Every structure is written in structure tokens, then in C-alpha cells.
Amino acid sequence: NQLVVKVPMKEISYNEDYPIVKLQVLPYMGASNVDEKGYMIVPEGTGGKINFNNGKTGQQRYQSDVYGWDYGQARTTIVDETKSNFPLLAIANETTQSSFLCVAEEGSSYATVQADISGKNNGYNYGTFIYSLIHGENMDVSTKSDTTVRVYEDGLPNETLSQRYIFSDKTDYSDLAKEYRGYLQKKYPSLGK
């Protein structure tokens, strides 16, 4: 009842003039349409719940950096943000009586969690991880000019991105929380002692 998707970054090729800045792995996995009932769990606090088709189309989509902002990056505006303390999202479809947890395992420090409801940009409720792979900054060409050039890191990190999907026929919030607890206990057995 699990699927593990791996993306070895050292095997990704790209034109150096057009670096791969962000990557989404299976972005619409488990997406549901406007006729389906259910919800998404996002890592807001101890687990926030976003109901499908909730009609809040005037609000921004949910987006949060896993483990918080990367302070190695320049910031030009003050942003009130929350950080995700755990690399998890879940989709529970009550219409089909199916659900899954998606855990960003390897490469989670590059991840941002994004979730949105139907009726804004498309007709789907979805949740996904977006990985920021190559960072860029605007650099001044010289002190005598106000021209800037976008400069990127030299290459992709030498890591493998890994997402684990844990499937279930349970759609109750507490059952999904227990499923995640079971995953953590299995992965980190010494923490339960």
C-alpha cells in the first residue's frame, strides 16, 4: 500500500542557460474534482485541514516552506509566514473512500508544501511538494550602473529527492494521524522508547 518516487538529481540534465529552478513530483496525484467531498491535511501547526470545494476562492492558496525560510536567500519584503515542522501532506477523498499520506523523505529541506481548492485556477483540489533546486539572486553589474544580472548556483545538489505515498481506505482525520504516527515509529524506532 505504498509508493516511493525517487528523483536522483545528478541524473537530471538541462541547458545551463535555463536552469531548473523548481521541480514538482506528481503534482496532481490524488487531485479531486468539484463533485467530490474530502479534505487535505497540511503541516500547519500540528496538522491543518483544508476542505475540498470550500468556496474560499478569494483567499490565497496554502503555501509553506518545510522547516521555514532558507535564510541563505535574500529577502526584500517582510512576510508573515508559518513554517512547516514536518514534511507531510495528505489527501482524503470521502467520495471514493480513499486517502494517502505523502511524506517528503530525502530532500525535504528543499520542499515547499502547496495546497489549493477547486474553482480558482482550475477545477481540482490538490496538494503537492515543490522543490527549490537552484537558487538565484540579482547581482549588481557595477557600482556605476543600476543594471542587475540574475546569477544562479553552479548546479543541482548531489542528492536524491524521495516522496513516499502511504495509501489507505480510511478517510478520518484521526486515522490518518495514526497512520503517520505508525510511519514515524517504524522509521525511528528508538524515539518511541
What kind of feature is each model-predicted range?
Residues 1-193:
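Carbohydrate-recognition beta-sandwich/jelly-roll modules
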